[in-house]
């Protein structure tokens, strides 16, 4: 059992925030191209091409998760695994695993460690306010290899629904970390195990943990 897990998204909100200290005090699960900048133990890449880049880039100590659909193509890499099965069954389109994205699967991977709490960091959901087209895409890797096909902000309704399902089917606390003025979906606010925190609050928590370990 792991006490704390941090699931790192790639929303613009985390730009400038140092996530490195989290590695010593949490089990870190990263999404997609985060491996270009950080050496993590666990990376989730549901996109086939992103998974290929990950296996070409990451060392053997990084476990890479991808969709069951692509898994057989990476059978020669011992550090590639299938994402876990969903903890529930539903009849809607957004309940089908193929319509789940990397962020939600990264959170599901985090749940496998049975932690006391999971930090959801930089899952920004919404497009950048006042910006249109690719400028409105809320992702620090936008425009780079593997992201050029994203021409406009993605409708976050599936993401909101799917994360909400994970909150519902888990025993742990979820701490959603974002900017002070970020709007958390109402459906998430209704969950008793979901809490909102700022980056400043997370930084204070990190310092407290690091002080404890000295």
Annotate the PLM regions.
Residues 1-214:
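Metal-ion/cofactor- or nucleotide/acyl-coenzyme-handling active-site neighborhoods
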